[in-house]
């Protein structure tokens, strides 16, 4: 019975993978590489470069690294501290980042990078795809807590964006308040013209 259920799960994951587009597959490859890098304790960018080199020779039977994967992995590596800080901030007291399954960390980092550093991806898409990766890779509890973490990061970013807009609007209003209004300026011009005219008549 257990073997049948395992086979069914694998079949379901395979079918789900086929339904997803190229970007999902690129995210999936990025998770694989980040997981491998942590397991081997090496720079994930080195793995990307290695795979790119090996893929040039068909005899190696290495799949080409998608362009988006080549963007994600260095992005995560470069901004790792900021990503981990954002993730840790939204973990419940029951979870600690360094004690999470390595695959969960990889999924969270990929999705968090998209939220924080890739404006081309709509935030909700980054969240949904991250949860989907968790469903495919990790344990049953992973999707729900990963969704909560990513949703928290997204809300923080939206709040920061709203505050920037509010600050810019306030600064603009303050600048306008310091300048004479158009009506006052016109009135001043009229008074000056009157003074000049009286001077000419005199």
Swiss-Prot record:
Coiled coil, from the record: none
Entry annotated with the keyword Transmembrane: no
Example of a GO cellular component annotation carried by this entry: cytosol
Compositional bias of kind Basic and acidic residues: 1-11
Keywords for this protein: RNA-binding, Transcription, Transcription antitermination, Transcription regulation
Keyword Transcription listed: yes
Record InterPro entries: NusB-like_sf (IPR035926), NusB_fam (IPR011605), NusB_RsmB_TIM44 (IPR006027)
Gene Ontology molecular functions: RNA binding
Biological processes annotated in GO: DNA-templated transcription termination; transcription antitermination
Protein role: Involved in transcription antitermination. Required for transcription of ribosomal RNA (rRNA) genes. Binds specifically to the boxA antiterminator sequence of the ribosomal RNA (rrn) operons.
Matches recorded under HAMAP family: NusB (MF_00073)
NCBIfam families reported in the protein's UniProt record: nusB (TIGR01951)
Protein name in the entry: Transcription antitermination protein NusB
Species in which this protein is naturally found: Corynebacterium jeikeium (strain K411)
UniProt lineage: Bacteria, Bacillati, Actinomycetota, Actinomycetes, Mycobacteriales
Gene from which this protein is expressed: nusB
């Amino acid at each position: 019975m257990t073997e049948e259920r395992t086979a069914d799960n694998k079949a379901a994951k395979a079918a789900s993978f086929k339904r997803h587009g190229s970007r999902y597959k690129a995210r999936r490859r990025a998770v694989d590489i980040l997981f491998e890098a942590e397991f081997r304790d090496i720079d994930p960018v080195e793995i990307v470069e290695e795979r790119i080199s090996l893929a040039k020779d068909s005899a190696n039977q290495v799949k080409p690294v998608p362009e988006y994967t080549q963007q994600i992995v260095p992005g995560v590596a470069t901004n790792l501290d900021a990503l981990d800080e954002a993730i840790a901030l939204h973990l419940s007291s029951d979870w600690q980042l360094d004690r999470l399954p390595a695959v969960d960390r990889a999924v969270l980092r990929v999705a968090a990078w998209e939220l924080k550093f890739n404006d081309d991806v709509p935030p909700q898409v980054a969240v949904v795809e991250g949860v989907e990766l968790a469903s495919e890779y990790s344990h049953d509890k992973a999707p729900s807590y990963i969704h909560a973490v990513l949703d928290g990061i997204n809300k923080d970013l939206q709040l920061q964006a709203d505050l920037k807009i509010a600050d810019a609007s306030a600064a603009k209003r303050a600048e306008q308040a310091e300048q004479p209004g158009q009506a006052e300026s016109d009135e001043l011009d009229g008074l000056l013209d009157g003074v000049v005219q009286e001077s000419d008549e005199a």
